[in-house]
Amino acid sequence: MLMPKRTKYRKQMKGRNRGKAHRGNSIAFGDIAIKAIEHGRIDSRQIESARVAMTRHVKRAGKVWIRVFPDKPLTAKPLETRMGKGKGSVEKWVMNIKPGRIVYEMLGIEEGLAREALALAQSKLPFKTKIVTCESENEIY
């Protein structure tokens, strides 16, 4: 599971996920990628399950880049606990995703096979995405 080695503070406020992605919104390493087209929140389990689905489909050929990292702690109180008594403990690590963010990239795989693998990964993600290539990347999302 992906999570930071250490953080300055154990818990964070919820915050708001607004606007478009200005960083990480273009293909940097591969030639085909998954791009988010709506707001969402992805946790370390979802990142890993999508990665496993892709790499198994292409039989570990080529290279896959994960362009997101869950650095925000998400807290939860135990079930059947009364309100109060402070904030709950950290349950999982998440990352807020904005429209336009590149989530995964692939290189060195035939395009048809890469599209199939990325489609498998898309089904594991909790927000709408689209598959982009270096040529089609500049389209509006």
UniProtKB/Swiss-Prot annotation:
Keywords: Ribonucleoprotein, Ribosomal protein, RNA-binding, rRNA-binding, tRNA-binding. Pfam families: Ribosomal_L16. The keyword ATP-binding does not apply. It comes from the Bacteria. Residues 1-23 are annotated as: Disordered. GO terms for cellular component: cytosolic large ribosomal subunit. The keyword Ribonucleoprotein applies. Signal peptide: none annotated. One of its GO terms (molecular function) is structural constituent of ribosome. GO terms for biological process: translation. Belongs to the universal ribosomal protein uL16 family. Binds 23S rRNA and is also seen to make contacts with the A and possibly P site tRNAs. Part of the 50S ribosomal subunit. This is Large ribosomal subunit protein uL16. It comes from Helicobacter acinonychis (strain Sheeba). The lineage of its organism: Bacteria, Pseudomonadati, Campylobacterota, Epsilonproteobacteria, Campylobacterales.
